[in-house]
Every structure is written in C-alpha cells, then in structure tokens.
Amino acid sequence: MEKGREIPGIVVAPQLAKGSWNPDKLLELIEYLQLNYCVDAKRIYICGMSLGAYGTLHFAGKYPNKLTAAVAICGGGNVKDSCNLSTIPLWLQHGDLDKLVPIKESQKMYDAIKKCEPNADVTFTTIKGANHSQVERLFHEDAMYDWLFSQVKQPVLYDHTKE
C-alpha cells in the first residue's frame, strides 16, 4: 500500500502494545467491521509477522471458519491448533537465519498440520539467507498478496441425501 499497491478491500492492521494476542478481541473487531462496513465474508484474510504470526495462527486455529486464508511469517503456534489450521489455506514463511524466532517454530506447525491432514492446503517457504528482520520485505512483494487474493471461501453445502 505504501509503495502504491492497490489493495482490493479493507485493510485493518491492529497493533499489540504488550502482552499476547487475544483471538476473541480480534473476532470482535472482525464482527464489528462486518456489521458496519461492506465486508465480503468469502474474502477475510489474516497475516502477521513475528508476534503477529503467532497471533495469526492463534486466531486461525481458534476461528478457522471466520477466515478465508492466512499467512504467518517468522512465527509459530500451538500444535493443538493444527487440525483447525488444516481447514484453511495457510502459507508459512520463515527465514533460515532467524535467531529471534527459530525456523523450527514454523516447521513444527507445518509438520503438525500435515500430520493431522496430509492433504491440507498449507505451504511452508524457507527464505534462504534471511534473518528475522529481513523477511519483512515479503510485505512489499506481490507474491503474498496475489496468493491471498486468489483464495475465495467456498460455501459449505448441506447434503440432505445423507440423512
């Protein structure tokens, strides 16, 4: 956005002053936006880096039905959320030289999601030669946005013939 990229939607960027992310507060924010703005429920995305990536996976793990897709950069999460995370398109990205949040944190989540659901739509990208701060550039590249905006939540259809 800062570099002139037009985002086809509403961008909300909550900041965390201290403590940890509260997925319930984020849900309240999303529901407020849906009530007060024209929000396409088939296109709700979340992404974050570092502590924001932990918050992304925490929220997506608790409320996967509220999202279309998620991107977590240089973060990690709770493997107990892996089965819920396996239900949405997810892109994990991590620098292989990250000393602040070791790459094993993203790898652990990827492995747990694939263990829960081998066909899960989860991608793990290692950014070669990048430390924690160097992966911030991903927010300035088209690949992440192109991938996110290509994701559209499909309606869940009820099959009454299986009663």
Regions found by a protein language model. Give the residues of each.
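C-terminal catalytic histidine-bearing segment of alpha/beta-hydrolase fold enzymes
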Residues: P89, Q93, L97-E163
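Gly/Ser-rich "nucleophile elbow"/oxyanion-hole loop immediately N-terminal to the catalytic nucleophile
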Residues: G19-S50, K62-P64
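Active-site machinery of serine-nucleophile hydrolases
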Residues: M1-L27
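Short acidic capping loops at alpha-helix termini that bridge into adjacent secondary structure
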Residues: D40-R43, T68-A69, A120-D121
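Active-site nucleophile loop of the alpha/beta-hydrolase fold
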Residues: L16, V71-V79
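Short, proline-enriched alpha-helix->beta-strand connector loops that line the catalytic pocket
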Residues: E6-G9, L85-L90
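Short glycine-enriched nucleophile-adjacent loop
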Residues: A53-P64, A70
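Short beta-strand immediately N-terminal to the catalytic nucleophile in serine-hydrolase-like folds
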Residues: I46-G48, I73, Q93
